[in-house]
Amino acid sequence: MIKAIIGKIIGTRNDRWIKQYKKQVLTINALEPTYEKMSDDELQNAFEELKKRVRSTEKDLQEKTLLEVLPESFAITREASKRILKMCHFDVQLIGGMVLNDGKIAEMKTGEGKTLVATLAVALNALKGESVYVVTVNDYLAHRDSKEMEPLYHFLGYSVGTITASVRDDDERLEIYSKDIVYGTNNEFGFDYLRDNMKYSLEHKVQKSHAFAIVDEVDSILIDEARTPLIISGPVDRRMENYNKADEVAKSMQVEIDFTIDEKNRAILITEEGIKKAENLFGVDNLYKIENAALSHHLDQALKANYLFFIDKDYIVANNEVVIVDEFTGRLSEGRRFSEGLHQALEAKEGVSIKEESQTLADITFQNYFRMFSKLAGMTGTAQTEATEFLEIYNLEVVSIPTNLAIKRKDLNDLIYKSEKEKFDAVILKIKELHDKGQPVLVGTASIEKSETLHALLKKERIPHTVLNAKQHTKEAEIIKDAGLKGAVTIATNMAGRGVDIKLTDEIKELGGLYIIGTERHESRRIDNQLRGRSGRQGDPGTSQFYLSLEDNLLRIFGSDRIKGVMEKLGLKDGEHIESKLVTRAVENAQKKVENLHFESRKHLLEYDDVANEQRKSVYKFRDELLDVNYDISAKIAENREYALNQIFSKLKAFDHQNLSEEELLGLKNILKEDFNAHVSLEDLKKASPIENFVAEKLKSDYENKMKVLDSEQRSRIERIVYLQILDNAWREHLYTMDNLKTGINLRGYNQKDPLVEYKKESYNLFLEFIEDIKTEAIKTFSKIQFENEQDSSDAERYLDNFSEEREHESVTYRHEEALDEDLNVAMKAFAKTPKRNEPCPCQSGKKYKDCCAKSGPKKGLFAK
């Protein structure tokens, strides 16, 4: 109450921001007459002067200089837009541009010209000479926006490029990223960052800096997509028959007897009866024994697939494949797969071919990718409901920009029916009424399944209509553009053509504009607001109303009993509804509960990913150092050699290494031969004094003699490439181990331990192990390098010539590793292959290598006779 009173007196924080920006608008407008009088050449020269001024400033002071030149830059950009695009930035659009430049989120309603607003901040920040990224949700918008704005940017002396999934050629991508302004999707930018950190040359990295990015539809990308990490992966061996068996077992189990469903948390809890049934069907005595861990995991995923995930809602089956439907946009997520074996479980459920599970080679969340930018800004029509999350996670403030014209759309109260059938009957009646009148109507549904239901009902009533869901996503822009035509009836899932305007004729405006019908409240208020926002653009008339039922998921799972109680007291007859602000508020409270659950889920994901992110940054930084031709890789190898020898001598019993027994010396001799390909006699070891210096000098001289056939450039390149391969392989194994750790860490909660604290502690220890593994593996590999012909360097030349940089998402990444091993065999011959940490130990103990000889040395031992 007090806060509201103070707000009315001094204005809200948003009001105060807008007031400050309006002062700048006056300054910009005062410059307009000056630039209007200039010729094109004079205007371009004036902008070039701004570039020189900013770029001649010290880097640390460039942001300050940008603020100083902002009025001139905005005024020139506006004048150029008038001449080139025949579009003039409104005052509110100038405010939007300033919000973006300040690294904030500009909340602008549909039709307010966000694409044009972005040009102001883009043109200003590109003055620094670093590429500016404009991020969109799909290839269509990236291509459309870049092509529409390109003439303006060219006039200002900027080059423009567009990154889409269709750009496959590495050289072409490199060329596009060299442009001043780069448009692209969040997925492409994120994957390119991961691919950059799998490259073997700094010159081949496409993203040179992360200076400034403007994220269009920022709520969709930074909120809705935040729970889905970007992953580049390669296949991993799994027994495919386990998925089908687990699916059979899951289908035979009964709800409430063998398992219970927690719909709020989307979880399955197996009962004691269910465990016994599963053990009987799998033919095992204890489902939760370590050796049956894979079976219990497959069963968990099969139960989720069968009882929590539904066809035409969470996924569709197309071309013998299970394709995910994005829950927020309603679009098909081509190429994306559910993790942890869930996708395979869905494939088994639907009887399509099961694709093998994959192992992570590189991954990052959008949260951590976009937080790398020195300055980040965003645009959307709906951000205030998530303002807390934007601030807490991304340090982004949300500023609501006033509309250019007052909003005339009427947002009516929700109508609530007892059953879904009654609700849809009422929706059909309303559509028929509007269609007969000629007023266009856009009907929003929460899933493909519901859009198909509505389609069938309209077909039965012979009402012509168009359906837009994930199955027709290729026609999205065309369908949405036509949604404002006279008599048009359009059914759309959540996708509803974001970024595509629905323009109305004067005749349609006279009829009342576009009528929005929502057939279900989404879990997020923001998605509902997006649907409403399709109507009433640029001061157009319009109406929106939601039709709900007590059988809707949101009300059934999260809605309070209060709504149900009200309806029962009123004694509503079939087909009757209630309409009240009290009920609408209760629905919004249910939405807030779900939004909070999702926020906590995203925060939880980020807390875990932050741990991995620190490790990722450390590894990628070291990787860049290795790629630098000035980095002293030979010194790093010498350092690793010293470390490896210290590890060996630290295991020797005797404190005084000069008094080693013959048994110990023999053990040392064997280790030197097996691990370092160093041939020393027992007599030499006995005579050596001090023995550590003798061994160190022996390993060093062997290596230097081997590398004599190479010139300094060849040697440096060979050493860097081999070291990079060792690092990449170790990182891949580390990610695999981290995935396994994360999968089981929540079980620590049953032992009264905080899973996150345990994860941080164990992941830190794993990272230390990872670093040690690199050091020891590096020196072993370099010690075993042997050129086929030690009299010339042709093998090395052949290796360097054949070394391929081709990487293309998952499969190419995996193929590249196979090709790399083959090339290494052409140029070098290793005398022994050290098993990977998770491979079976060669001593045939039955344990993994990391739990056996990796710790204690080979079974014949350091002190073997």
From Swiss-Prot:
InterPro entries assigned: Helicase_ATP-bd, Helicase_C-like, P-loop_NTPase, SEC_C_motif, SecA, SecA_CS, SecA_DEAD, SecA_motor_DEAD
Pfam families in alphabetical order: P-loop_SecA, SEC-C, SecA_DEAD, SecA_PP_bind, SecA_SW
Binding site for Zn(2+): 841, 843, 852-853
Location, primary (coarse class): membrane
Superkingdom, natural source: Bacteria
Cofactor: Zn(2+)
UniProt keywords, alphabetically: ATP-binding, Cell inner membrane, Cell membrane, Cytoplasm, Membrane, Metal-binding, Nucleotide-binding, Protein transport, Translocase, Translocation, Transport, Zinc
PROSITE patterns: SECA, SECA_MOTOR_DEAD
Keyword Ribonucleoprotein: no
Reactions listed under catalytic activity: ATP + H2O + cellular proteinSide 1 = ADP + phosphate + cellular proteinSide 2
PANTHER family associated with the record: CHLOROPLAST PROTEIN-TRANSPORTING ATPASE, SECA INNER MEMBRANE COMPONENT OF SEC PROTEIN SECRETION SYSTEM
Assembly description: Monomer and homodimer. Part of the essential Sec protein translocation apparatus which comprises SecA, SecYEG and auxiliary proteins SecDF-YajC and YidC.
Entry's family note: Belongs to the SecA family.
Function: Part of the Sec protein translocase complex. Interacts with the SecYEG preprotein conducting channel. Has a central role in coupling the hydrolysis of ATP to the transfer of proteins into and across the cell membrane, serving as an ATP-driven molecular motor driving the stepwise translocation of polypeptide chains across the membrane.
Protein name (database record): Protein translocase subunit SecA
Name of the encoding gene: secA
